[in-house]
C-alpha cells in the first residue's frame, strides 16, 4: 500500500491513506521527527504497529513516552552516523514474548539453542532425531554483535540524553532561521530527537545552488533519505499507482546536512550567512 508523505513530519500524509482495513503498519520516525502514531491507531485500530527508530533515538510522544515503546516492536540502528554507535549493528525492542524469542534465534542462524531454557527443552523434545546443538527452527542470519561493540554502545548510552538535548537546541535554531520563502519548514515538535537539518527547496531548481554552497563550505550533504521510493528500481513498476506530489518535492528539492552534539551555533550561523549571501 502506497501513500504520500507529510511535508512537516516526513511521515504518512493522512489524507492519502487508504480507507480499507490495514493489518500491519511499519512507521518510520524519519530524521528524528515525530510520526503521528496516535492518529494512525485511530484510523487503523486493529493493525499491528512496528516502529523504525533508526535515526530517532529518544524521540518522544506528546504524552512523554519514548517512541519505540508503543507498538509490537521497534528497530534501532547504532550505525556510525546515528545518535549513538556501536560502529555497526543495532537492536530490536519488544514487550511481546513470542517476538522476543523469534528475534533471538533469527539473529543467530535460526538455532534453537538461543531460546529461553524451557522453550529450548521443548524444541529438543519435539525433534528427538536432530542434534540439539544444531537444531534450526527457522531461517536466520548471523547478526550477533560483539562484546567490543557492546562496550562502545554502553559508554555512549550514558551521554545519550545530554546529546539529544544539544541536538534539539540545534534543531530549534535551524527551524527559527531557515527562510520559509525558500524552504518547506519541518515541524519543530518538542519531543523531536533531531538527526539532521533538512532543506527542502520550494523551487526544485534551487537545490543545485544549495548543494554548491554546502560544497564550498566543505559540508557533506545527502538527499532526504531515499526521496520518492517509487522512483527506485525495486518499486518502479508501482510508480503510477498513487499520486505522491509531496514525496516528489522531497525527492527533487530536498537535501540535508548533519546535526549532532558537535555542531555549534557558530557553525550554523556560518551556514545561514552563506545561504543569505550567495542565494
PLM regions: where:
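Short beta->alpha connector loops at strand-helix junctions that form conserved
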Residues: 1-7
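PLP-dependent aminotransferase class I/II
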Residues: 4, 24-28, 33-38, 46, ...
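Active-site phosphate-binding strand-loop segment of PLP-dependent enzymes
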Residues: 8-86, 91-101
Amino acid at each position: 500500500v502506497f501513500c504520500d508523505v507529510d511535508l512537516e513530519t516526513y511521515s504518512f500524509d493522512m489524507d492519502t491513506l487508504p480507507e480499507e482495513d490495514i493489518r500491519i503498519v511499519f512507521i518510520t520516525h524519519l530524521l528524528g521527527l515525530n510520526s503521528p502514531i496516535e492518529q494512525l491507531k485511530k484510523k487503523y485500530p486493529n493493525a499491528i504497529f512496528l516502529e523504525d527508530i533508526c535515526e530517532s533515538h529518544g524521540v518522544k510522544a506528546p504524552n512523554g513516552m519514548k517512541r519505540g515503546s508503543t507498538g509490537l516492536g521497534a528497530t534501532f540502528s547504532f550505525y556510525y552516523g546515528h545518535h549513538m554507535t556501536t560502529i555497526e549493528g543495532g537492536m530490536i525492542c519488544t514487550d511481546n514474548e513470542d517476538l522476543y524469542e523469534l528475534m533471538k534465534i533469527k539473529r543467530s542462524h535460526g538455532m534453537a539453542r538461543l531460546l529461553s531454557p524451557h522453550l529450548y527443552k521443548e524444541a529438543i523434545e519435539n525433534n528427538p532425531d536432530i542434534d540439539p546443538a544444531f537444531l534450526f527452527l527457522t531461517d536466520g542470519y548471523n547478526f550477533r554483535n560483539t562484546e567490543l561493540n557492546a562496550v562502545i554502545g554502553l559508554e555512549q548510552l550514558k551521554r545519550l540524553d545530554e546529546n539529544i538535548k544539544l541536538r534539539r537546541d540545534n534543531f530549534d535554531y535551524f527551524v527559527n532561521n531557515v527562510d520559509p520563502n525558500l524552504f518547506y519548514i519541518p515541524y519543530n515538535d518538542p519531543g523531536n530527537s533531531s538527526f539532521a537539518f533538512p532543506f527542502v527547496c520550494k523551487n526544485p531548481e534551487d537545490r543545485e545552488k544549495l548543494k554548491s554552497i554546502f560544497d564550498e563550505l566543505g559540508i557533506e550533504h545527502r538527499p532526504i533519505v531515499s526521496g520518492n521510493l517509487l522512483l527506485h528500481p525495486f518499486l518502479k513498476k508501482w510508480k503510477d499507482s498513487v499520486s505522491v506530489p509531496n514525496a516528489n518535492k522531497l525527492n527533487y528539492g530536498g537535501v540535508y546536512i548533519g546535526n549532532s552534539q558537535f555542531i555549534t551555533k557558530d557553525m550554523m550561523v556560518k551556514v545561514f550567512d552563506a545561504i543569505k549571501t550567495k542565494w
